[in-house]
Amino acid sequence: MTRRYWNINLKEMIEAGVHFGHGIKKWNPKMAPYISAKRKGTHIINLARTARFLSEACDLVFDAASQGKSFLIVGTKKRATDLVASAAIRARCHYVNKKWFSGMLTNWSITKTRLSQFRDLRAEEKMGKFQHLPKRDVAILKRKLSTLQRYLGGIKYMTRLPDIVIVLDQQKEYIALRECAILGIPTISLVDTNCDPDLANISIPANDDTMTSIRLILNKLVFAICEGRSLYIRNH
């Protein structure tokens, strides 16, 4: 994996509040190597470690994107839904930002069937086929389509399992991480001071509660993916 410079600087991370962890009573002892201090009852994350692992993650996604690999971004925290969608669309990644359904990856054959139904319904609506149906049937189909769009809209073009999964909240997306571990899919995860850094292939110690922190980390990763995609296009 080629090491590159991703313009990750301390001042920017401090301004975004990346260094603020949880209260000292809520910590996971496995996070001790990533904590630099305690301040007013709160653990402070070591930003030198954040920069190191964020840089490693950027290198990984750049290399993967330059080879045409696919990505899935998972972040179902309500405040982050729009951020996840816009970042994923910008980098041409799949995303889940509403709810992670258990078995979404491990029961891929079922997920694939649902996605096929979703695409068929969208096509039928666009072609005007709903117009020839009774109003009651149209209402049922539109409700079904709306539900599918809400929960599967971010993965509607996903035809196979992703090559890399990026998780923005380890505790909230624990099931997604476990499914990736079972399937051997590499994962990148933000880990706050109450998380387990051993659950992902690359764990980035960072505040996973503040939007400015999540945005900064995600934007760095998305930039690296976009750079990798550009290289892939130039070479093909």
UniProtKB/Swiss-Prot annotation:
Subcellular location: Plastid, Chloroplast
Entry keywords, A to Z: Chloroplast, Plastid, Ribonucleoprotein, Ribosomal protein
Taxonomic superkingdom: Eukaryota
GO biological process: translation
Cellular component aspect of the GO annotation: chloroplast; mitochondrial small ribosomal subunit
PROSITE patterns linked to this entry: RIBOSOMAL_S2_1 (PS00962), RIBOSOMAL_S2_2 (PS00963)
InterPro entries (alphabetical): Ribosomal_uS2, Ribosomal_uS2_bac/mit/plastid, Ribosomal_uS2_CS, Ribosomal_uS2_flav_dom_sf
Predominant subcellular localization, coarse grouping: plastid
Matching Pfam families: Ribosomal_S2 (PF00318)
Cited Gene3D superfamilies: Glucose-6-phosphate isomerase like protein, domain 1 (3.40.50.10490), Helix hairpin bin (1.10.287.610)
Entry's Gene Ontology molecular function annotations: structural constituent of ribosome
Similarity annotation: Belongs to the universal ribosomal protein uS2 family.
PANTHER family registered for this protein in UniProt: 30S RIBOSOMAL PROTEIN S2 PROKARYOTIC AND ORGANELLAR, SMALL RIBOSOMAL SUBUNIT PROTEIN US2M
Annotated HAMAP family: Ribosomal_uS2_B
Protein name from the UniProt record: Small ribosomal subunit protein uS2c
Lineage of producing organism: Eukaryota, Viridiplantae, Streptophyta, Embryophyta, Tracheophyta
